[in-house]
From Swiss-Prot:
Pfam families: PseudoU_synth_2 (PF00849)
Gene Ontology cellular-component terms listed: mitochondrion
TM region(s), chain numbering: none
Entry keyword Mitochondrion: yes
GO MF annotations, alphabetized: 21S rRNA pseudouridine(2819) synthase activity; pseudouridylate synthase activity; RNA binding
GO terms under biological process: enzyme-directed rRNA pseudouridine synthesis
PANTHER family per the UniProt record, alphabetical: 21S RRNA PSEUDOURIDINE(2819) SYNTHASE (PTHR21600:SF81), MITOCHONDRIAL RNA PSEUDOURIDINE SYNTHASE (PTHR21600)
Record lineage: Eukaryota, Fungi, Dikarya, Ascomycota, Saccharomycotina
Listed name of the protein: 21S rRNA pseudouridine(2819) synthase
């Protein structure tokens, strides 16, 4: 696979693709020459697949993103994201974020018009975040503007600068849980070696997510 993309799971209905920083989830302006996820993916896979983007990550965000492998799967994921409950194919999206301040509360729900985010602190400067809705910049806005805890290297929302790291913020799509019928499947997505600079204070010596953070990411409910 490309150094920018890596298929970490390939199933019947969907795949999980690791997206590196600098890759767009959807085409930008005509003048934007950065690679686009779906175009890159179609160019890399040998077989011709009917692929649909389900989960969109900002270009500066790393980690796992869900790609449906047929139109029906895309429709079923979309139905769940719009209606929730038992409709469609269930999808839980959890992220790891390093932040510039410690939240006042260890866990909670952040709400603003049309947006709901859950969070749980796992380190003084690190939280696990779960999306209920998925609006543009939702996590970045909620952490910075509602919790006063901007994400490290996210200068757009007031985060501190990490020298030598450009085009990447300390926000990583680390866990995806799907439910298709009675089948529930968990996908833990680590941080690739070339993108670990922002995470060195969190990761183990081997560059892995530590056990306590994995337990929080994979628990049934965040709180």
């Amino acid at each position: 696979m490309s150094a920018r993309l890596k298929v970490v799971y390939d199933g019947m209905h969907y795949m999980i693709v690791y997206k590196s920083a600098g890759v767009l989830s959807q085409p930008g302006l005509a003048s934007d020459s950065r690679p686009v996820l779906m175009s890159e993916l179609r160019g890399l896979l040998s077989e011709t697949l009917d692929l649909y983007s389900v989960q969109r990550l900002d270009a500066c965000v790393t980690g796992g993103t869900v790609v449906a492998k047929n139109k029906r799967a895309a429709m079923m994921f979309s139905r769940y994201l719009k209606q929730g409950g038992g409709s469609g194919y269930g999808l839980t999206r959890r992220y790891l974020a390093r932040i510039n301040a410690q939240p006042v509360c260890d866990e909670g729900t952040i709400e603003s018009p049309g947006m709901v985010t859950y969070y749980r602190r796992v380190r003084d400067d690190c939280v696990v975040v779960e999306l209920k809705t998925g609006k543009k910049h939702q996590i970045r806005k909620h952490l910075a503007l509602n919790l006063n805890c901007p994400i490290v290297n996210d200068t757009y929302y007031g985060g501190s600068v990490v020298k030598g790291v450009n085009g990447q913020i300390a926000l990583h799509s680390a866990f995806v849980r799907t439910r298709i019928g009675k089948n529930m499947q968990d996908h833990l997505v680590g941080i690739e070696p070339q993108e670990q600079t922002l995470w060195k204070s969190i990761l183990t010596e081997n560059g892995m997510l530590p056990d306590d953070i994995v337990r929080t990411l994979t628990r049934d409910k965040l709180f």
